[in-house]
Amino acid sequence: MIKVIVPDFSDKKFSDRWRYCVGTGRLGLALQKEYIDTLKYVKENIDFKYIRGHGLLCDDVGIYREDVVGDEIKPFYNFTYIDRIFDSFLEIGIRPFVEIGFMPKRLASGTQAVFYWEGNVTPPKDYKKWENLIKAVVSHFISRYGIDEVAKWPFEIWNEPNLKEFWKDADEKEYFKLYKITAKAIKEVNENIKVGGPAICGGADYWIEDFLNFCYEENVPVDFVSRHAYTSKQGEYTPHLIYQEIMPSEYMLNEFKTVRDIIKNSHFPNLPFHITEYNTSYSPQNPVHDTPFNAAYIARILSEGGDYVDSFSYWTFSDVFEERDVPRSQFHGGFGLVALNMVPKPTFYTFKFFNAMGEEMLYRDEHMIVTRRDDGSVALIAWNEVMDKTENPDKEYEVQIPVGFKDVFIKRQLIDEEHGNPWGTWIHMGRPRYPSKKEINTLREIAKPEIMTSHAVTNDGYLNLKFKLAKNAVVLYELTERIDESSTYIGLDDSKINGY
């Protein structure tokens, strides 16, 4: 039995930086109905403020085109699709966190590409045309949405240039050239627009030191630092899936701390620091993303990550995603909070649970957080991620919680291996690749958490709450004031109902 006594007062605030931004598949996917329907659903339930994805300048979005006029090739900037995409985002109430990339094929210096949809990762063959493209894009955004709006959008330059897969030869010097020209082009359009980078993945934090030194020495604009974070090791690949060992959650939190310290010790100690991608695995084919384990694992990141970064963006909100190809089955290890056919995964509910938290943080440890809301109600989240195949994974708790009212209504929501686990039900179904409408409805029904309610009376201002967490459980308790109006019902007597 784990016993916890929650103090009645705290001067600590719980940050909501975990919902500042969420990731998405390439922007061209936003032209699909299921994508937009899912984004609306996620926004309504979790209320992310920004959305970030690849592909702004890729050919499927169609911004950069060229016309042949006589003997001359003239650029043509086509904003038909990006207007439709960004209009949709803003109508839903979510702003773009703009990633500048990848290279339009007509402007590329080579043919190297990444992903099924062939994002070109080579430098521009003509940096002047690139500069003009950037100015045209930013100018169009300002013309359409106004500078007051666009000034709220961070502009991140490229994606993981420290990897050869994402930037030709992982050439740091060439990336710095691209960054300098791009950042200055954006600032020439309007100096109030925020620019940053280098958007690297883990294992290359020296890039951040080099990047900040470069910006200082070359007087290059930089308004924020960005990085990605994943905790999976090298994997075992199959034709359809990848299996990887996941390192403990403190590994990711330590990465957050390390980069924050690098920034503090740089020439720009006060720069905002954004984690623009994070998850357990970096592969969209790892089944871990579909599991209750992922939900329990991510809980600690949501609880503590805001201590070290200005935002951290879960990768991604939906399995409408095509890096490795069009998804081949209902569950396939996709990154999304929501699976195909709008089936919420367990991790979706971890985020939704955190959306219920208050600002005053009364208590926090590695497996629990307790907050008080403005109205005096209390919200508690606890989790039990199980990293190995232990025989006795359950944890029992007794928590004394300060509650500012005598009579308490208790609402409990729970996900674990047996509750709110559509992946498990899909396995019971026989793993149908393309489930029928009936099967999809069953998966949606199963995806909901178990909900239980009760009421209790406090003792000297405290409520004693006992509960058990099974393997990979995440639980949300909400304690609100109970107003009993039973005395207003004349002749009320439930004992006269058969069986009561």
Curated annotation (Swiss-Prot):
UniProt keyword Nuclease present: no
Which EC class, in a word?
A: hydrolase
EC assignment: 3.2.1.37
The active site is formed by 160, 277
For this protein, the record's PROSITE patterns field holds:
GLYCOSYL_HYDROL_F39
Q: List, in alphabetical order, the Gene Ontology terms for molecular function in this entry.
A: xylan 1,4-beta-xylosidase activity
InterPro entries assigned to the protein according to its UniProt record, in alphabetical order: GH39_as, GH39_cat, Glyco_hydro_39, Glycoside_hydrolase_SF, Glycosyl_Hydrolase_39
Record keywords, A-Z: Carbohydrate metabolism, Glycosidase, Hydrolase, Polysaccharide degradation, Xylan degradation
Q: Which reaction does it catalyse?
A: Hydrolysis of (1->4)-beta-D-xylans, to remove successive D-xylose residues from the non-reducing termini
The family note in this entry says: Belongs to the glycosyl hydrolase 39 family.
Q: What is this protein called?
A: Beta-xylosidase
Q: Tell me the organism.
A: Thermoanaerobacterium saccharolyticum (strain DSM 8691 / JW/SL-YS485)
Q: Gene that codes for this?
A: xynB
